[in-house]
Amino acid sequence: MSIKYLTFYYPNGQKKSEGNYDGQEPIGDHTSWFESGNIKCEAVDLTESKILFTHWYENGQMKSKGVHKDYFESGLWTYWYDNGNKKSEGFYLDKDERVGKWKFWHSNGELACIGIHKGWSGDGLWTFWDETGNKVHEREYRESELLDVWENLRADGCSDELVDKYKKYIFN
């Protein structure tokens, strides 16, 4: 292993990335930029296996922030829309497995849903709101029952468009 501090540049001379590298692989602290010069990603080495990652959209708004442990999302992660409004927030166990209470927001800043994750399925009360803040659905879901939520939302009068948004919020 031959670790070197390197700086890479775009053809226009703008910095692309810099930090410690093992060959072409970033190791530890690392920063990258968009070709426009705006910061894209910052990685701060917390321990040998934990790195704090912060990502930005090209417009300068923060995109996501959280810790990677052994290359997987771990602990509290927060995500934002490119307009600066919060998109989602919740906890990961090892290997990107969601756990506990997760919150999801519509792009206009209104709360979209709150639910309890157990892995990638539900395990508890899930509440959904439309883009104007009206509660549209609330129900306890256990394990694989969360897959039934889409039909239950439609039965409660949610449009296909709104149901599709919830799917993207929860599973993307």
Predicted regions and their residues:
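Glycine/tyrosine- and acidic-biased, solvent-exposed loop/turn segments at the edges of beta-strands
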Residues: 1-172
